A protein has these predicted regions:
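Domain-edge interaction signal
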Residues: 1-157
Length: 157
C-alpha cells in the first residue's frame, strides 16, 4: 500500500488548468488533462514511492482516464477547458514544483499524442487485457503497475 498525500485529483487538475498559458496559445482539452494527470501520478509514484492522489485511472479506449475528471470536464468535448476562476489551489511548494515539471515535460503535447504514448506503455496495455479495441473498459490501472513502469522510465534516463 502506498502512503497518501492529502491532495485530490481535482487539486492537481486545477493546478494544471491554472498553469496553462492561454495568452501564448496553449490549451488543455479534457483528453490532455486526463493524460497529464496520469503522467503526474505515474512519475510521483516512481520518484516518491507514494501516490500523488488516491483516485484511480481506468484503461479506457482512449488511454488512462479517471471517471470523476471525465464527468466534470466532458462538456468541453474537444475544446480547451477554461481557466477556473473560483478554485483556489492549496498545494505545497514541493508538489507545485513537481507538477510544474510534469507540465513542462508533457504540456507541450496535445491530448492525441499523449493518448498514443499511453497506448505503447505497459500499465495501460496490461489493464486493457481482455478488452477489445475500442471497447468500453473499466479495468483499473494499478498504482503498482504504474510505479514499476515509471521507475524503469526514470532509470533509463
Amino acid at each position: 500500500m502506498f502512503r497518501k498525500n492529502s491532495l485530490s485529483i481535482f487539486d492537481a487538475a486545477n493546478f494544471f488548468l491554472k498553469i496553462v498559458d492561454r495568452d501564448a496559445g496553449s490549451t488543455i482539452t479534457p483528453l490532455k488533462l486526463q493524460k497529464i494527470l496520469y503522467y503526474a501520478q505515474g512519475y510521483y509514484l516512481a520518484y516518491y514511492d507514494k501516490e500523488l492522489f488516491s483516485e484511480d485511472f481506468e484503461a479506457w479506449a482512449h488511454g488512462p482516464a479517471n471517471e470523476a475528471i471525465y464527468n466534470k470536464y466532458k462538456k468541453y468535448g474537444f475544446d480547451s477547458i477554461p481557466c477556473p476562476t473560483d478554485e483556489t489551489i492549496n498545494i505545497s511548494d514541493n508538489i507545485c514544483a513537481f507538477l510544474s515539471d510534469i507540465w513542462q515535460t508533457f504540456g507541450i503535447y496535445d491530448g492525441k499524442f499523449l493518448e498514443e504514448q499511453t497506448h505503447k506503455e505497459e500499465p495501460w496495455i496490461k489493464a486493457r487485457k481482455g478488452c477489445a479495441i475500442g471497447e468500453r473498459c473499466h479495468n483499473i490501472i494499478t498504482k503498482e503497475s504504474m510505479k514499476d513502469f515509471f521507475k524503469t522510465v526514470i532509470n533509463d534516463v
